[in-house]
């Protein structure tokens, strides 16, 4: 593909506008030629941002099909509401427009099957933009795993633990899709931040696969009580019910014998964490306190606080296992979004496009990680019964080559 990528953005809410400002307009190898959102004020805001950052004028649309037809961009960032990610991506793929699709859950298995089918048919480049796969903790743990330092991996865990009550309750005013999802669905609705890095570490879809899923949800009272406590701010939500359980725990099994535990925790008071954890026969990694622990580091210790104090940020001792991107990170890269991982994922996307390389987070990854929303919804509805996990590779997982996103000295 050409050295200068003609880029477009569909979906200009908080995430889309943030990536436009933080990453896309700053790249020498990309030019944002068009933007689209159903809300015209968001379109105008984005056009101003492009003009102020680059001095160039892009074209704004409220109909993404019209934009794709008239502008014929080389690539598109899909960052609209969750419900429309796949629909827009399929339309772009069929037109030969490379797709960078933002994260979220899905709504049916057929939706994912169709996405995979269209990408396989068109061979149009597609990357699932799970930025947490590029974060410092996740890449450190992956490289320690690849070096054999943790021994054989047995279990991984992760969470999306983020107090989103104000964002959800403000959904009408801010036109945010989370409100309707939390009112009417009960599932693991945002699994990919924790599941993506775990799946890559376990080589899911490339020598390993998920085989079953069990999910249970707590009662849903966090949002209702939050609305009551802030009734003057959210009068339209007073008395409204929310289907989404306050905590959802999901357990997955793997063909390789590993287990994976996920937690969705977004409607009760708390601080942010992803709780990324890797357990092996020779040690473990815990991202919350950046702990690297190897067998024998500490003897039998019953004072848990003492052990945490001794091992706190011990991951810093293993900087040689960080990929080059993190060892040489600049302030500009850190400021591009989420401490650097947004820059790294888009750098990968554009590099793969220009060099005609396979995307490291592909359509099979997208389908596998997104389908957790649907499967968890089914399992919760069945009282926590196990449900089989579909294989979107149609058996190719046995022999597909694996590719990590950020290896040492890559």
Each PLM stretch: what is its role?
Residues 18, 271-280, 284-289, 295-410:
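C-terminal helical cap and adjacent loop that interface with cofactors, partners, or active-site loops
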